[in-house]
Amino acid sequence: MFQDAEEKPRTLHDLCQALETSVHEIELKCVECKKTLQRSEVYDFVFADLRIVYRDGNPFAVCKVCLRLLSKISEYRHYNYSLYGDTLEQTLKKCLNEILIRCIICQRPLCPQEKKRHVDLNKRFHNISGRWTGRCAVCWRPRRRQTQV
């Protein structure tokens, strides 16, 4: 489909423009499991501001299940260290709102309120493969392990 590296769109919006289609109609396969993404997974991919990858010139995204699995594997294999918000600002000499911090689980970029929540609750941000992670509001909630009576 796209052979030249220069012409390969990296975002889903750019890919839709190149293919003259919309986010609501495009069909992409998962780069890991090769299944076609569900519509909600396509929207999640856009919302998380993830990048398209290419295999043999064809565009691929990643499904929700594979993304969570890859995030967990990356956390185990490439964890470097953790810092509190204030220390992170001092280390990078930037305000938290200027630092790209993604959710450690779903990879969505954290908004200023989610970053503030980490600071207010004295939670750390984690450096994994040189990228900063925390938890978004959706993934922050603990999951119930069993039915409570």
From Swiss-Prot:
Keywords: Activator, DNA-binding, Early protein, Host cytoplasm, Host nucleus, Host-virus interaction, Inhibition of host innate immune response by virus, Inhibition of host IRF3 by virus, Inhibition of host RLR pathway by virus, Metal-binding, Modulation of host cell apoptosis by virus, Oncogene, Transcription, Transcription regulation, Viral immunoevasion, Zinc, Zinc-finger. GO terms for biological process: DNA-templated transcription; regulation of DNA-templated transcription; symbiont-mediated perturbation of host apoptosis; symbiont-mediated perturbation of host ubiquitin-like protein modification; symbiont-mediated suppression of host cytoplasmic pattern recognition receptor signaling pathway via inhibition of IRF3 activity; symbiont-mediated suppression of host type I interferon-mediated signaling pathway. GO terms for molecular function: DNA binding; PDZ domain binding; zinc ion binding. One of its GO terms (cellular component) is host cell nucleus. InterPro entries: E6, E6_sf. The keyword Zinc-finger applies. A zinc finger (unnamed) spans 30-66, 103-139. Belongs to the high risk human alphapapillomavirus family. The cancer-causing human papillomavirus E6 protein has a unique carboxy terminal PDZ domain containing substrate. Plays a major role in the induction and maintenance of cellular transformation. Acts mainly as an oncoprotein by stimulating the destruction of many host cell key regulatory proteins. E6 associates with host UBE3A/E6-AP ubiquitin-protein ligase, and inactivates tumor suppressors TP53 and TP73 by targeting them to the 26S proteasome for degradation. In turn, DNA damage and chromosomal instabilities increase and lead to cell proliferation and cancer development. This is Protein E6.
